[in-house]
Each structure stands twice: as structure tokens, then as C-alpha cells.
Amino acid sequence: MGQKFSIKCKKQSKNKNTSKCQKIPKKAYEGPPGSYMVKAKYKYAASGDTDISFEEKEIMYVLEQFDEFWLKVVKQKDNKEGLVPSNYVSKQDGSPQSVEAWREIQRWEAEKSLMKIGLQKGTYIIRPSRKENSYALSVRDFDEKKKICIVKHFQIKTLQDEKGISYSVNIRNFPNILTLIQFYEKNGIGNTHIPLTDPMPDNYQPPVHFQDIEINRENIEILNEIGRGFFGSVHRAKWGRSYEVAAKMLQSSKAEREKFVLEAKIMHKLRHRKIVELLGVCTEPQDMPMLIIVEYMKNGSLKEYLKTPDGKKTNLNQMVHMMAEISEGMAYLESEKVVHRDLRADNILVANDLTRKVADFGLTELTDGSLGDQEKKTLRFPYKWTAPEAAKSKVFTSKSDVWSYGIVMFEILTWASSPYPDIPAKEVIEKVSKGYRMPNPEKFITGVCCPDEIYKIMIWCWDANPEKRPTFLVLQEKMDLLIVDTLTNNAYYSHSK
């Protein structure tokens, strides 16, 4: 629906029959009563009878919240009604989250993105800030003296009074974020008056969450096998008409299926950009393998990636970024009381944009980590990654995951070398229980660089007392600080215009 006009005419004089007509714009269409406007962040192709397709930037009006992950909308351009995934649209309410430039990322990720070759000066991102009641505007600039690209950050304060919410940069106030952007597009920002040009291109497309945890098997087309492990085989698959997913095939009894579905309903609600999200399960018919449907990561595991020609070029700064992404995903799981139990480079997957995501936590229990007596007898675990107290008691906690994270750090620093290379797997638990710890890997693996500040974090993760180990939130903060240090030194990101 475009903007409508009415014709208003008035006579120019009482002696003339001619009149002057003006087009007077009517009030912009605001959608059905009780609805609110959203704009599509991505293109979407419908996969069933109840959802509808739409184009990027298309305007729709939300009629109701259908469930936790889907909205019922009517499209502005053709009045079609149907369901759309809520994470594919943004509410047009003047907030930072409503504009194209919004990214749910940290400062170092904004700097990494904005320093990519080919972007013009003034490319920008709006993101969360660690400062209270604030957001951040990150802008690409060019230092003419040093001849390097840099990123500048500006605080956007949120103000609230009887008139509502407004936003402030320095001492200038704006009624909404769009007005703020338009002002700095025209006038420039900062001491050097950098004009905002374009939002940072967004190559990430989030997974589409199924409307129900239980998926009709007929809607899943199994394609080629891409992996096999202790829990079963993993296949590339297609959901509906166009969406690639990964399907894990598990053989299980009826009782095991019922138990897993209960756990899956909890895991289905876990949403974070640094974890591989569980999209649904297929448990029927009973005589066929159970399917666990998750995001498809075409680059495979981090272990596989580090062994590729591109992976072998990974430098120390990039390795620290990997560690930071994993700690962020694990910090989220920790906050949700989820214990992984099998954190390894094999269970970190690499997305299309090379983002690293924590995977396979969905095959673990979600409570306090305790198992039944019979389960403890048959439980298998990777000796070289498992904390000694967990190996002995079969009780896994977030702190035993932290131990495993220290081993993952070793894997990353050594391009996926096997930990404890000279010790048989079944002897590792006994040796570490007696106080043995792997030395700094740069001392026994050629070409490895592991600064003392990184090795100290590894040793901290391997403290014999679980309570003295850091939390994942603390580890995330430590990794962020390491990245900020490297950025300050221009060790990785500086390049010519």
C-alpha cells in the first residue's frame, strides 16, 4: 500500500472559474487496528501452508504473537496473511534494534567486521554497550597520517522522561535512532566529522525455528551423510522447500525417546548466535531412527577446519577470536544451567561466515549433571578432555566443562593436535589426578605461539579444585580483553585504505 493522496482545490479569485489544486498527502497507513509494523531483515521462502514468503525490507503488520517464535502478519503490499519467523523481522519502533545497522555483537566483533577490505569510510554498526542505559555506534574511518583504517566508537545514551524514550550522542538529543542516523549522514560524527554512509552488510541469516518441537518426517528430505560419531550418523538434509539443516540419526527405545523429547523441549528454547540451535526432532514412526534437526554448518567441525589449508594459516589473533566465540557460547549455556559434558574442537562447528558455534550440548542432560546408577556404568567420555573429578564420579558440571575448555584452547593453538600426545588416553586421568599438566605447547610443538598470559588461563582452567576454576563468563571477559589488547596494538586489523 503506497501513500494515498486527496485533492484539495481552492478558487484563485471570485472573478475566475479556474482553481488551483494541490495534492495533500493523507496520513500514512498504520495497518489494521491493534497491529504494529515490522520490516523484514532477510528474504524468506515459505515452507508450508501456514507461513508466507516475503522479501528483504518488506513491510508487514503483526496481528498477533502466534507462539514464542512465530508471528501472524498481514503484508502491506498485497494484504496476504500468514505466519512469519519472528527472528526474521524487526519492530519499527524507532529503537536501535529496528534499523539495518543493528548487530547483537561485542566491540571486538564490530571492529573485526568493519576492518574488512572493501568497505568504505563511514560504514557503521549499532550494537549493545556494556555501559548502563547505552548503545554504541561503531564507525569505520581512515587515519591519513598513519595510512591505516581504524574504527571509532561513540556512546549512544538512552534517555527517558514523561514524553518517552530518546537518544543522545554527546549533548545532542534525537527522538529516535533513524533521526540520529540521518543527522550524522548529513553532518558527520566525531572530531573528524565522519559522514555515516552505509550499514555494515549482514551476511548472517539465522535459523528458522519450527513451529512445533515434533516435526513431520515427511517434511525432511535426507541427503548425504556428513559425519558419524558415538551417538549415530549425521546427514545434510532439507526442510520444506529450500532450507538446509543437519539431521542426526539415533537408534533409541521408546523410553529413551520420551525422555529425550522432554529434554529437547527445553533445549528448543535455547537461542544464541554462538551455539548450534536445536530446531526440532522426529520421533515417529517408532520403527525408524529418531532424527534430531539442528542448524547446518557447511564448514564442518573446528577440528576439521584447523587441518585445512586455510585453517593452517590461522594466526594467534584469529585463534584468540575462536576462543572468545566459544567462551561466549559456553557462558550462555552456563547461564541456562546447561552442562555440555563433551566440549572438544570436534564439537565446535564452523558456520558459513566462519563464526564458531558450540554444538552437541543437546545430547546432554540439562539439570545438575547427575546420572542414574545404570547410566554411570555405561557412560563413555573422552578421557583427554574430561576433568578428573568428572571422570571418577561421572558427575559433570559447568566447572568440568571449563577444564575441557582449557583443552580446546590447546587444540586451537596447535591447529587441532591431539592433547597429551605421548600419553595413552586411559592413563591421562591418573596422571592429571597426581598433578601432571601439559606444558606450554610452544615448548614441545614446532611453530606454536602461546604467550604466558594465554597459558596461565589454560592452567587456571585445569585447577585441581573445580571451585577455583573460572566461570565461562569470566573466561569470556578475559578473552575480550586479550582481543582489545591486540586491536590496540594494530597487530591484526590495520591495513591500507
Curated annotation (Swiss-Prot):
<feature type="region of interest" description="Disordered">
    <location>
        <begin position="1"/>
        <end position="25"/>
    </location>
</feature>
<feature type="domain" description="SH3">
    <location>
        <begin position="33"/>
        <end position="94"/>
    </location>
</feature>
<keyword id="KW-0418">Kinase</keyword>
<feature type="binding site">
    <location>
        <begin position="226"/>
        <end position="234"/>
    </location>
    <ligand>
        <name>ATP</name>
    </ligand>
</feature>
<dbReference type="Pfam" id="PF00018">
    <property type="entry name" value="SH3_1"/>
</dbReference>
<dbReference type="Pfam" id="PF00017">
    <property type="entry name" value="SH2"/>
</dbReference>
<dbReference type="InterPro" id="IPR036860">
    <property type="entry name" value="SH2_dom_sf"/>
</dbReference>
<dbReference type="InterPro" id="IPR008266">
    <property type="entry name" value="Tyr_kinase_AS"/>
</dbReference>
<dbReference type="InterPro" id="IPR050198">
    <property type="entry name" value="Non-receptor_tyrosine_kinases"/>
</dbReference>
<keyword id="KW-0728">SH3 domain</keyword>
<dbReference type="InterPro" id="IPR001452">
    <property type="entry name" value="SH3_domain"/>
</dbReference>
<dbReference type="GO" id="GO:0005524">
    <property type="term" value="F:ATP binding"/>
</dbReference>
<comment type="similarity">
    <text>Belongs to the protein kinase superfamily. Tyr protein kinase family.</text>
</comment>
<feature type="domain" description="Protein kinase">
    <location>
        <begin position="220"/>
        <end position="482"/>
    </location>
</feature>
<keyword id="KW-0597">Phosphoprotein</keyword>
<dbReference type="Pfam" id="PF07714">
    <property type="entry name" value="PK_Tyr_Ser-Thr"/>
</dbReference>
<dbReference type="GO" id="GO:0004715">
    <property type="term" value="F:non-membrane spanning protein tyrosine kinase activity"/>
</dbReference>
<feature type="domain" description="SH2">
    <location>
        <begin position="100"/>
        <end position="200"/>
    </location>
</feature>
<dbReference type="InterPro" id="IPR011009">
    <property type="entry name" value="Kinase-like_dom_sf"/>
</dbReference>
<keyword id="KW-0808">Transferase</keyword>
<feature type="binding site">
    <location>
        <position position="248"/>
    </location>
    <ligand>
        <name>ATP</name>
    </ligand>
</feature>
<feature type="active site" description="Proton acceptor">
    <location>
        <position position="342"/>
    </location>
</feature>
<keyword id="KW-0547">Nucleotide-binding</keyword>
<keyword id="KW-0829">Tyrosine-protein kinase</keyword>
<protein>
    <recommendedName>
        <fullName>Tyrosine-protein kinase SPK-1</fullName>
        <ecNumber>2.7.10.2</ecNumber>
    </recommendedName>
</protein>
<dbReference type="InterPro" id="IPR017441">
    <property type="entry name" value="Protein_kinase_ATP_BS"/>
</dbReference>
<keyword id="KW-0067">ATP-binding</keyword>
<dbReference type="InterPro" id="IPR001245">
    <property type="entry name" value="Ser-Thr/Tyr_kinase_cat_dom"/>
</dbReference>
<dbReference type="InterPro" id="IPR000719">
    <property type="entry name" value="Prot_kinase_dom"/>
</dbReference>
<dbReference type="InterPro" id="IPR036028">
    <property type="entry name" value="SH3-like_dom_sf"/>
</dbReference>
<dbReference type="InterPro" id="IPR000980">
    <property type="entry name" value="SH2"/>
</dbReference>
<dbReference type="InterPro" id="IPR020635">
    <property type="entry name" value="Tyr_kinase_cat_dom"/>
</dbReference>
<keyword id="KW-0727">SH2 domain</keyword>
